[in-house]
Amino acid sequence: MRSHFCTEVSEKDIDKIVKVAGWCNTYRDHGGVVFIDLRDKSGLVQLVCDPSSKAYEKALEVRSEFVLVAKGKARLRGPGLENPKLKTGKIEIVLEELVIENKSATPPIEIGNKNVNEDLRLKYRYLDLRSLNAYEIFKLRSEVALIARNTLAQKGFLEIETPILSKTTPEGARDYLVPSRVHEGEFFALPQSPQLFKQLLMVGGMDRYFQIARCFRDEDLRADRQPEFTQIDAEMSFCDENDVMGVVEDLLREIFKAIGHTIPTPFKRMPYKEAMENYGSDKPDLRFELPLVEVGDCFMDSSNSIFSNIAKDSKNKRIKALNVKGADATFSRSVLKELEEFVHQFGAQGLAYLQIKEYEIKGPLVKFLSEKGLKNILERTNAQVGDIVFFGAGDKKIVLDYMGRLRLKVAEMLDLIDKNAWNFLWVVNFPMFEKTENGYHAAHHPFTMPKNIECEDIEEIEAYAYDVVLNGVELGGGSIRIHKEEMQKKVFERINIHEDEAQKKFGFLLEALKFGAPPHGGFAIGFDRLIMLMTQSNSIRDVIAFPKTQKASCLLTNAPSPISEEQLRELHIRLRKLSLKDMI
């Protein structure tokens, strides 16, 4: 049907007959001469038709998004008529034949216009996908998937599919449940990850497994979350942390070659505690400096009892300083107020600061600090004339969080972030357990190998867990797994999953660990998130062909939707409205 894609027509085709196909991107009638910009997956080429052509009458019928097949002679555009913005900007095709394969209603969205309301774009996603930018995104997505497959296959990994209909197990988020028609009152769960099955593959001697896996989590959505998502998932036997990290680094190095970027390996490694204390995040963005500095001891003799009491509880409290170089010249009083309001939404009671002037130091904290304390703060933060030093004080977890967010906010305001940089980092030595309102739970998942399970202070137990971070975004992570039944039971006990419950939920895993499970570990990389970063897209929805909204609905198909009474009966389900009493 065609001899060339639109942008394949070049100067070497001058005076030759070519045949192209695609959609009418724009239509113009200039004094009887018709110009059509034809668009296909490769880009645009200009068609031109004057009244002498036998295709002229047909060309007059063309409108936006009509599907066309065009045949004509390629020629150079006239002097001054070239379009340097187009790959085909020096040439045009003089129409000899034109077939309208299909007409189009007036499109409800302008193809390629990112300023169109996102809900409207998602409702007409098939039109939104016609944009050249969308094609480039999904072309890269396809290339990256192929690179991942080839790279892992060359390293001896087997691509093996794991079940989609599985057993509900607690992994941190709610499961999507599927009622069984055959087993009345029982449910399958869609997998949040292939975690347990890939471990069982290692028990089964598969040695190295991978898949590009579909996963499902019924959780509150954010810009980088979807209820169904894809991850590059892998597991390997007889390995340690270094082996797994090496595979991930090799994989990402090959993937980033696809966009012409050579990333240095090995990646820098940073312990979790260092990341939290110095950057206020377990996924620090290291494209810029601005570290947090601990200054609690500088307030030990403060005349302000609030600060001095915080300083004396170094286990549970923190006083952190953030020196913003040169900020005194650019941060007005209104900006300082804006920053205070910003951190307030994350639990800060206020935002104290010192302004380093040429002949004095100003700020509400000055009068509460001893001369020695002030001197130590200035030295430790390397504060100089023109700087502003911000302070966060209070509960350790809250202070680290809002000061880390302040660090990012200030970096964005001062344009300190190199948008063209790719900064990879391993965060290691995560805590094994985290405290919640209902006790402790596994920070990653309960199948991660702990480093010091016998430690009396549960919060000091670390895990053989590791996250790979790119530009302040968690790209993926993994861990060395527990491969002995006794250790798995100890971990369950630490998070109050007692023997009966453990057997009910994970009996199949505990049984498998009795039969010579090898040491093993693995990783998962968020595939959608990776493509979002590589294409510098604003939302993960831009890199998924048919994404859900932030309310977990599909505007294109109107899913989820009610089902018929007959379907409910087949599934042995009856719906009823809950009363207030039922919900209490």
From Swiss-Prot:
Residue stretches spanning the membrane: none
Protein's name in the database: Aspartate--tRNA(Asp/Asn) ligase
Name of the top EC class for this enzyme: ligase
Family affiliation: Belongs to the class-II aminoacyl-tRNA synthetase family. Type 1 subfamily.
Gene label: aspS
Annotated segments matching region Aspartate: 195-198
Positions marked as site (Important for tRNA non-discrimination): H30, G80
A GO CC term attached to the entry: cytoplasm
A Pfam family assignment: tRNA_anti-codon
Biological function: Aspartyl-tRNA synthetase with relaxed tRNA specificity since it is able to aspartylate not only its cognate tRNA(Asp) but also tRNA(Asn). Reaction proceeds in two steps: L-aspartate is first activated by ATP to form Asp-AMP and then transferred to the acceptor end of tRNA(Asp/Asn).
EC code: 6.1.1.23
Chain positions recorded as ATP binding sites: R217, D218, E219, Q226, E474, G526, F527, D528, R529
Gene Ontology biological process terms, A to Z: aspartyl-tRNA aminoacylation
